[in-house]
Regions:
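Short helix-capping segments at alpha-helix termini
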Residues: 14-17, 33-35, 129-130
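Conserved beta-strand positions in the Rossmann-like core of class I SAM-dependent methyltransferases
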Residues: 19-22, 135
Length: 209
């Protein structure tokens, strides 16, 4: 979801930071309404582990799934760690200087929780590749339209979203549900700001004030 929201933000008429936006994925993207096709170049690669990244200044990676959707821990790791790292390495080799990547709240390479551990390992790996700027977004539960992307309905997630909306005043900001558009906004703005080094955006920091 965040990837779609990032694309919409990068192609909005008011955003003139990028003359050309390259879109890399396993299938051709559904472009946002009104997106200027003259500024878009789509690259489809069946294997993201072998994808070729064109020369660019910045790159945004918003790959992610769940263990239940992936089918196994190894399949989850292949996408959320291996594919993300492969793309980041290819981007660095292509001359990309600034990287924005979507992770998750709770990411910790030393965690006993498999999901959190893989996310943490991914963060450490991409941070060590030598980019001038790395921005890592750690959203809590994402609130957005999965159906529009052809993603399966996650019943437990839908129930959690309903509960979190009702109890929002009682939930710490870092663990409140957050919209995909808000994550995209914060991530793009932070990458464009270009602060040197590694910057982590916690979910509460990305929530609207």
């Amino acid at each position: 979801m965040v990837g779609r929201a990032v694309l919409a933000r990068l192609t909005a008429d008011k955003n003139s930071a990028y003359a050309v936006v390259h879109i890399l994925g396993r299938r051709a993207p559904e472009l946002p309404a009104g997106a200027p096709s003259a500024r878009l170049v789509s690259h489809v690669s069946k294997s993201l582990l072998e994808a070729q990244v064109p020369p660019a200044d910045d790159m945004f990676i918003a790959l992610g799934t769940t263990i239940s959707v992936a089918g196994s821990q190894s399949a989850f790791r292949a996408l959320d760690l291996d594919a993300v790292l492969a793309l980041a390495r290819a981007a660095r080799a292509a001359g990309v200087r600034r990287l924005g990547v979507v992770s998750a709240m709770g990411a910790d390479a030393g965690s006993q929780v498999f999901y959190n551990r893989v996310k943490g390992e991914m963060e450490l790996a991409v941070s060590a590749l030598g980019f001038d700027t790395v921005v890592i977004a750690r959203p809590s539960l994402l609130d957005g339209e999965r159906a529009a992307l052809g993603q399966p309905t996650r019943r437990g997630e839908q129930l959690a979203l309903k509960v979190m909306r009702v109890l929002k005043p009682l939930i710490p900001r870092n663990y409140q549900a957050i919209s995909d558009t808000q994550v995209a906004k914060a991530l793009v703005e932070a990458v464009l700001a270009g602060r040197p080094g590694v910057q982590i955006l916690l979910s509460g920091q990305m929530q609207p004030r």
